[in-house]
Amino acid sequence: MALAFDEYGRPFIILREQEKKSRLQGLDAHKANIAAAKAIARILRTSLGPKGMDKMLQSPDGDVTITNDGATILELMDVDNQIAKLLVELSRSQDYDIGDGTTGVVVMAGALLEQAEKLLERGIHPIRVAEGYEMASRIAVDHLESISTKYEFSATDIEPLVQTCMTTLSSKIVSRCKRALAEISVKAVLAVADLERKDVNLDLIKVEGKVGGKLEDTELVEGIIVDKDMSHPQMPKRIYDAHIAILTCPFEPPKPKTKHKVDIDTVEKFQTLRGQEQKYFDEMVQKCKDVGATLVICQWGFDDEANHLLMQRELPAVRWVGGVELELIAIATGGRIVPRFQELSTEKLGKAGLVREKSFGTTKDRMLYIEKCANSKAVTIFIRGGNKMMIEETKRSIHDALCVARNLIINNSIVYGGGSAEISCSIAVEAAADRHPGVEQYAIRAFADALDAIPLALAENSGLPPIDTLTVVKSQHVKENNSRCGIDCNDVGTNDMKEQNVFETLIGKQQQILLATQVVKMILKIDDVITPSEY
């Protein structure tokens, strides 16, 4: 406990707990918060665009991840600072809602805070800056709506969807196969989409991977792939016109629910018990045969004796299948999951045209393909790759492509990429600033400057002089009144993004601006940071 005096000479007591806390107030607090956010944005800035760099992250367990997906980088970074954690949440929110644009949203938030710092140093109140940013974000979102284009597609004409997915995949490691992967992603989304209701359930798309083969071997399977094999090596490897019993109950004689003890003191009693168990299991197998099942898929295991009996009775079985996979199998085959064995009936069986076991390479790895299902609304994207890291990164890339295709089905408006949308918004926001006579005018201009961070980063990452490139494109926007001009990252020779087929979804771009502004406003309103000091 310590004694201190205020400005009037009155004594007051400082408790030991308060002595242990460090405190930042006013402009110092704002600067510390902005510095933390800028540090995170600086890390992600080099990963933006088709020429963006990848990051290698090592977990405490020694697992290595190589990725340029913003949400994944931030998820795996061990961030202590609370403001940095806000940006991690921001990226996760963009990933959850839109699936793409996770790097851009953090870069934009960092640029907005960098501009805000200059205004705060000039003595402008943070609330006025936040209000100016809110006005500017509304102007930018409305402008995006005005420059957007409706992109018509159908179940037969999927080229618009493929082109948009290719834009997403062009910044990933898998960009050399972007055409094939984009087509696979679009076909998978259309298989599970309800185009009339504009509804897509991505849970019906299973993404599975296996080390071996090359990326070009990635395929779309109209059915389900399960990383299991038949329970007995002598069971048939192909079953045509399969009737599948899907069990979540144990495929074995029932055990008493209460504590019990069985006294066996003679060989006869043991043989009676064994015979009873065998008889019970025999009846279970017979019931499966009677209802017409030609394949049993079980969530639980069964012992070797039961397995041998199944093989003898010519009833193929698969054991230890996960709950999520069982659900997908039930949806695909039109079957019902059976929780109690007594409820098994012919109506609850799933139907598939072909169930086959496929082996890979010289290893003993086998997987089960369930194809030609009664209901084709569940599909699997099966990824091949040279190593585990490649497969994991491909899964993340395909997730982004699936989300983009879904967003385009929900709302088929697109804006042009390559930084063209941000440059156009920057010009529109700058022009609108003059219509606001208050201090907010400075914040609106700062917002316009912050929007330039995306095209500047794209140019920088592509090895172009950033400021020179941006000024040329901006003047072209104004002279030609052409909102499609962006940064020519791939050195094609034209900066018209329509000719380069670089598209982004309107809702994704709007969400980026709104989420970044929202988080920046929250950070600007923090003027006091109290943290426990280090021991």
Curated annotation (Swiss-Prot):
InterPro entries: Chap_CCT_epsi, Chaperone_TCP-1, Chaperonin_TCP-1_CS, Cpn60/GroEL/TCP-1, GroEL-like_apical_dom_sf, GROEL-like_equatorial_sf, TCP-1-like_intermed_sf, TCP-1_chaperonin
GO cellular component: chaperonin-containing T-complex
Any one GO molecular function term: unfolded protein binding
Segment forming the signal sequence: none
Keywords annotated in UniProt: ATP-binding, Chaperone, Cytoplasm, Nucleotide-binding
Function: Molecular chaperone; assists the folding of proteins upon ATP hydrolysis. Known to play a role, in vitro, in the folding of actin and tubulin.
Protein name: T-complex protein 1 subunit epsilon
Source species of the chain: Avena sativa (Oat)
